[in-house]
């Protein structure tokens, strides 16, 4: 079974906890009327909970994230269940639970939870990315392309790492859909001066398409020397695995269409 590290990292590095404060004053000031209007209904509902329940909820979510980072999936689910019993309308719960299902390769359940998270946190790039990624690993290329083209418009300009990765996935989706000219243009969008692995992985992808495996491996080796942090390259490498270019570390080959 192939692991999808990217979704795991995304769920933990962007946990969406910004929607609620981690600490609550003993005597919180009454929110201004404009602040109330800016809150989503589920956010306001959370703030209406007793302080002790809010603290317990946040404690459970933080513990779930900690356990998830350690790949302790069933313990993560147990903590999420604690949080769910306190407050059900939380995108954090569904986003992280969906990521747990991804680790278990239960894609239908993952997609269902990610969609629930998206309903509660509109236009959140990390959640929308997760939906696109489920379509990507299940080979639903048009749906994946549609989602990633939406995500690229939502990613903040200062989040280049995610933005470049999304563009790479768009490139690969277009290749699968027969849009070769678009894919070629995207493969040449950045050069070696770019501060991401995009250039090298795009070159490798094009080499794989030409059945030039040696050249593809050379490009990946160069990327490995330049970006020597495994955490940086992991989502790019996993993308090639899920796309079908290379074998996973589990010895399985992705199914080509």
Question: Where do the model's predicted regions map?
Answer:
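Alpha-helical segment of the N-proximal tetratricopeptide repeat
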Residues: 50-89, 96-99, 103
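Start-of-helix register in tetratricopeptide repeats
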Residues: 58, 92, 126, 165, ...
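TPR/TPR-like (Sel1-like) alpha-helical repeat modules
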Residues: 148-156, 168-178, 185-195, 208-209, ...
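Register position in tetratricopeptide repeats
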Residues: 69-70, 103-104, 137-138, 172, ...
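Canonical tetratricopeptide repeat
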Residues: 95-96, 130, 166-169, 202
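Terminal, low-structured helical/coil segments at or just beyond the last alpha-helical repeat
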Residues: 25, 37-42, 47-48, 213-257
């Amino acid at each position: 079974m192939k692991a999808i590290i990217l979704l795991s990292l995304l769920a933990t590095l962007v946990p969406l906890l910004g929607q609620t404060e981690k600490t609550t004053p003993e005597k919180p000031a009454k929110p201004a009327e404009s602040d109330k209007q800016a809150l989503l209904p589920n956010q306001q509902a959370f703030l209406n909970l007793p302080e002790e329940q809010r603290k317990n909820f946040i404690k459970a979510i933080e513990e779930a994230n900690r356990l998830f980072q350690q790949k302790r999936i069933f313990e993560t689910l147990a903590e999420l269940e604690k949080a769910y019993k306190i407050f059900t309308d939380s995108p954090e719960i569904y986003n992280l639970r969906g990521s747990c299902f991804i680790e278990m390769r239960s894609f239908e359940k993952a997609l269902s939870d990610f969609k629930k998270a998206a309903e509660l946190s509109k236009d959140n790039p990390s959640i929308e990315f997760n939906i696109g990624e489920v379509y990507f690993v299940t080979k639903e290329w048009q749906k994946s392309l549609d989602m990633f083209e939406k995500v690229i418009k939502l990613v903040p300009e200062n989040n280049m790492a995610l933005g470049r990765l999304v563009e790479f996935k768009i490139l690969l989706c277009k290749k699968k859909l027969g849009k070769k000219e678009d894919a070629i243009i995207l493969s040449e969008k950045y050069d070696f001066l770019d501060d991401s692995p995009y250039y090298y992985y795009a070159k490798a992808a094009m080499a794989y398409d030409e059945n030039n495996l040696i050249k593809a491996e050379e490009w990946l080796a160069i990327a490995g020397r330049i970006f020597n942090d495994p955490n940086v390259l992991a989502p790019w490498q996993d993308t090639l695995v899920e796309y079908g270019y290379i074998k996973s570390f589990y010895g399985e080959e992705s199914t080509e269409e």
